[in-house]
């Protein structure tokens, strides 16, 4: 009797793969574990270590008396819940230290003070890093260098980041043993839909100022596979900020990013440990 033609049935098999780069990304806690604790405080930085961060990121400015302190904004209004609106550059460290910068987040953090760079350096565990963002210009590099040298911290534990291009150049000149990354963000033209700076403009700047790496806004419209491949060809490290979403984090993981800056280090580490999911058709012959 004739053989019944075989019927090819197609089933979807979910294949889980752990990519080689999946666990390679460093987790950088943006202003500390700032989703859960008041940003840029010792409480937020300590919590970041507890949540498994590889590095903390903090913003640093100069006071009127030349002290390097950790604060994002140029004034104190937001982190005091509006109780004090002082320009950091116009007041002394002693006056800034009278402010409570914790209770605006939660009562449990009442009493947190604006920390100095020296205090932040003192709580960095061995093997962990500080991404030190310079809020200002090249004039901050020498004061920061003095604090770093006096602290005795290893240069390998410090990464300096800055939007200001002249600051990047000054760091390369005065702190050649410390890595420096250029920070970049993008704006979209409402009429044309184009993003600026363009990829070509980014690479022109990199070629001119020669940082060790690029710390870029996590914008997949600009930062795509060809962008990353070019970064690697030209010898730059590849870092992104600020991601609190698991899907976005995995997208950049799969592009081979070196570090992800996040407000939620524990969550993003958990999300990055999820395997990459691929689907393929597997034919099964049934007689």
Task: Please identify what each model-predicted range represents.
Residues 20-287:
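Phosphate-group recognition and catalysis centered on beta-loop-alpha active-site segments
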Residues 9-20:
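Bacterial N-terminal signal peptides
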Residues 1-9:
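Positively charged n-region of N-terminal signal peptides that target proteins for export
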């Amino acid at each position: 009797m004739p053989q019944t033609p075989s019927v090819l049935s197609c089933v979807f098999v979910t294949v889980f793969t752990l990519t080689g780069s999946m666990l390679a990304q460093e987790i950088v806690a943006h202003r500390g574990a700032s989703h859960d604790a008041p940003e840029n405080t010792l409480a937020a930085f300590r919590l970041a270590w507890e949540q498994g961060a590889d590095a903390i990121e903090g913003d640093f400015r100069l006071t009127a008396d030349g002290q390097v302190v950790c604060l994002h904004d140029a004034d104190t209004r937001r982190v005091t819940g509006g109780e004090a609106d002082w320009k950091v550059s116009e007041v002394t460290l002693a006056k800034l230290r009278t402010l409570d910068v914790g209770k605006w987040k939660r009562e449990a953090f009442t009493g947190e003070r604006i920390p100095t760079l020296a205090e932040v350096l003192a709580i960095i565990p061995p093997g962990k890093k500080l991404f030190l963002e310079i809020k200002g210009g090249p004039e901050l590099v020498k004061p920061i260098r003095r604090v770093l040298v006096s602290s005795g911290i290893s240069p390998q534990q410090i990464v300096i980041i800055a939007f200001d291009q002249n600051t990047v150049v000054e760091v390369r000149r005065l702190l050649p043993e410390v890595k420096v990354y250029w920070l970049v963000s993008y704006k979209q033209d409402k009429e044309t839909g184009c993003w600026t700076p363009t990829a070509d403009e980014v690479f022109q700047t990199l070629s001119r100022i020669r940082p060790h790496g690029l710390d870029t806004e996590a914008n997949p419209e600009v930062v795509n596979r060809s962008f990353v491949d070019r970064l690697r060809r030209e010898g730059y490290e590849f870092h992104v900020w600020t991601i609190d979403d698991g899907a976005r984090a995995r997208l950049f993981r799969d592009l081979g990013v070196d570090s992800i800056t996040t407000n939620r280090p524990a969550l993003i580490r958990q999300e990055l440990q999820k395997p990459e999911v691929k689907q393929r058709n597997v034919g099964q012959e049934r007689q």
